[in-house]
């Protein structure tokens, strides 16, 4: 590329990281980010200024790389600005990656294609303890237990996992990320890459696939029903052999949006260990305080933890006694704690912080009701874990809810944001303790019948890994 050419990344959001890593792999410097969000125009990201899109016309010699899932909208915007010819596509970047691999001396690497297939499970972009990472770790461990060669790809900045998962994990640093991932994948050919985040590891897998098309297969997993996540995975769909969706609703949406054939798109109910089930409280114990449980990242995006304060207000308006235990950490934690202290609700609302996975079963066995106020989900693992312990779900109408909850029979599903109705259903369960017990038993039965871990791994081996 011309040394005088300015390189600009259009998109300063969560996907900027992987584009930065891709440019690092290519030894390509970039100069600016740009973004349509005006609140970012005074900030720097990875040391680079974020400028308004209106400034792009100031650079007659520039290349613009769209580092956002809103690719089509941004392409249209740039075309209307007369800058369509400045766009550098991902395909162009991958072509450069292919040239780099051809020129790079690989003599020091053992890239002999072996007989045994290695399954590489992507966990790199996650925070280390979110639902996607725990799902990835569980899948890897299950496949390893079934005799498959498996590695988890994680980051050095993530917290350590349980020992049984950590022994399967290769930690990649943020320096030269994609280069190290490419080398790891080459050393483990042939391999199947399980794409969970459409991030740096996905880019590395595509680079390897372009050079070894018969020895690298990619399976993409869609973990929630956010359309932007669909786009992040499907922008490079020609490199993907199969799609796995964590709910049947997501599969339906994917097939509608992308006209995908059934043989490419799969779904199986999430696995939950149900060997130790809670003994549900007898119907006669009607005087115990009702216990509510919430376990998720305390963040606004997706989880809408900022609405927990409003939900607590709605509970208080109902005038019944309860204990609401909140397990998690994040940007909304201090705000919730301040509200609880200011209104002297410490006896009713307890913030426990993030609990390790090993303590979650005990947490749910203490609760009567599972609360979820998310704006979108895949299939909530917390919900399934809680239901397996006999907790009655009172949740928003997100993906996966209707697959396990029949409204009014084993739980309640409310419109997204309808906190008053959620509080009303909680109050009704407080008044009808027999219903609380019967709903809880039904929850345990459906999880035991449909979420068998062994069957889940068999399904993956038969349908996704062959």
Predicted segments with their positions:
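Conserved donor-binding/catalytic core segment of Leloir-type glycosyltransferases
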Residues: 118-120, 283-303, 309-312
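Short His-centered aromatic/hydrophobic patch
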Residues: 195-201, 222-225
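Nucleotide-activated donor-binding/catalytic signature segment of Leloir-type glycosyltransferases, i.e.
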Residues: 337-354
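A short, active-site helix/loop in glycosyltransferases that binds the activated sugar's phosphate group
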Residues: 230, 238-264, 272-274
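Short alpha-helical donor nucleotide-sugar binding micro-motif in glycosyltransferases
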Residues: 354-355, 362-367
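Aromatic "clamp/platform" in nucleotide-sugar-dependent glycosyltransferases that forms part
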Residues: 375
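Short hydrophobic beta-strand element within catalytic cores of glycosyltransferases
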Residues: 392-395
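A conserved mid-protein helix/loop that constitutes part of the nucleotide-sugar donor-binding site
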Residues: 133-138, 299-314, 331-337
């Amino acid at each position: 590329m011309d040394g005088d050419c300015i390189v600009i990344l259009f998109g300063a959001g969560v996907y900027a990281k992987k584009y930065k890593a891709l440019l690092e792999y290519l030894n390509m410097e970039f100069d600016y980010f740009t973004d349509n969000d005006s609140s970012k125009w005074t900030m720097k990201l990875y040391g680079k200024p974020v400028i308004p899109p209106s400034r792009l016309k100031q650079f007659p010699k520039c290349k613009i790389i769209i580092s956002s899932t809103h690719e089509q909208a941004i392409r249209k915007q740039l075309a209307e600005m007369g800058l369509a010819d400045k766009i550098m596509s991902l395909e162009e970047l991958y072509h450069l990656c292919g040239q780099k691999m051809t020129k790079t001396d690989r003599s020091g690497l053992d890239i002999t294609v072996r007989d045994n297939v290695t399954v590489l499970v992507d966990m790199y972009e996650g925070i280390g303890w979110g639902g996607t990472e725990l799902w990835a770790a569980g899948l890897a461990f299950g496949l390893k237990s079934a005799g498959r060669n498996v590695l988890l790809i994680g980051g050095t900045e993530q917290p350590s996992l349980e020992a049984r998962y950590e022994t399967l994990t290769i930690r990649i640093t943020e320096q030269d990320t994609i280069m190290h991932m490419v080398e790891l994948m080459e050393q483990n050919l042939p391999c199947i890459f399980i794409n969970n985040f459409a991030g740096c590891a996905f880019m590395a897998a595509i680079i390897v696939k372009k050079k070894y098309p018969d020895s690298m297969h990619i399976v993409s997993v869609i973990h929630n029903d956010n359309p932007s996540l669909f786009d992040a995975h499907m922008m490079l769909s020609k490199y993907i052999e199969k799609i796995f969706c964590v709910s049947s609703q997501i599969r339906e949406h994917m097939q509608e949006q992308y006209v995908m054939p059934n043989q490419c798109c799969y779904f199986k109910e999430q696995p939950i260990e149900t060997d130790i089930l809670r003994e549900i409280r007898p119907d006669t114990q009607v005087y115990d305080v009702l216990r509510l449980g919430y376990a998720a990242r305390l963040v606004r995006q997706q989880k809408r933890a900022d609405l927990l304060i409003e939900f607590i207000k709605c509970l208080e308006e109902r005038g019944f006694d309860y204990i609401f235990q909140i397990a998690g950490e994040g940007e909304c934690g201090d705000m919730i704690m301040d509200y609880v202290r200011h209104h002297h609700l410490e006896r009713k609302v307890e913030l426990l912080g993030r609990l390790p996975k090993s303590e979650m079963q005990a947490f749910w066995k203490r609760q009567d009701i599972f609360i979820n106020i998310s704006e979108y989900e895949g299939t909530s693992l917390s919900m399934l874990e809680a239901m397996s312990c006999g907790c009655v779900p009172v949740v928003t109408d997100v993906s996966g809810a209707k697959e396990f909850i029949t409204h009014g029979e084993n739980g309640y599903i409310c419109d997204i944001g309808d906190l008053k109705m959620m509080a009303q259903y909680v109050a009704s369960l407080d008044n009808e303790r027999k219903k609380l017990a019967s709903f809880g038993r039904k929850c345990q039965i459906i999880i035991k019948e449909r979420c068998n871990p062994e069957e889940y791994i068999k399904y993956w081996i038969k349908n996704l890994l062959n």
